């Protein structure tokens, strides 16, 4: 499986700035400048603010980004899209963002299909945000359940009326930086549906 990156593994720039006490303000300024002016002088502006937390915790390092993201969202109206590691910390992400002023109607908690408990999903959805069931096709790797388990979870949520708060996707990689990975034959077979047509061909007919 792919390794899990933790905040302790990250490049030292913001870790150093965190020690100086200036990191959160710099993160805020970076987010705002990229959203309003573009990335690195390119003029290309992001469509979302992406935030991420670790498996089973939101570290103090990660919380800086969540607070800065919530602050920038209030000023720009940008959508916040998060990464959850194996579907953990979804409710905690939402509470942290809302506590710092983020609009729940513009929050998407991503990779929630890493968790197959409908009641857990409802803890997130009932706070007024949307969730991404967005890793269809990724199975047996990075802690991912099998698609059939995801479908059963999705059906339970649809039956309970949450259809307007759920987004479906594949989390596919369209352009690899460097060489694309070569998977062992068994893994390649399990992952054969990790491609953009999978939802339309195989998932939607089950709903």
Please place each PLM-identified region on the residue numbering.
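Short acidic/histidine-rich active-site segments
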Residues: 80, 133-135, 163-185
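Glycine-rich anion/phosphate-binding loops
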Residues: 1, 20-33
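Short, small-residue-biased leader/transition segments that mark boundaries at the very start
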Residues: 2-7
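Mid-to-C-terminal alpha-helical segments outside catalytic/metal-binding sites
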Residues: 194-207
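Active-site glycine- and acidic-residue-rich loops that bind
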Residues: 109-115, 135-159
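Acidic (Asp/Glu)-rich catalytic clusters
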Residues: 1, 34-44, 71-74, 98-101, ...
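Divalent metal-binding pocket/active-site signature
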Residues: 38-115
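Active-site-proximal loop/turn and secondary-structure-junction residues that shape catalytic pockets
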Residues: 9-11, 53-55, 86-88, 113-116, ...
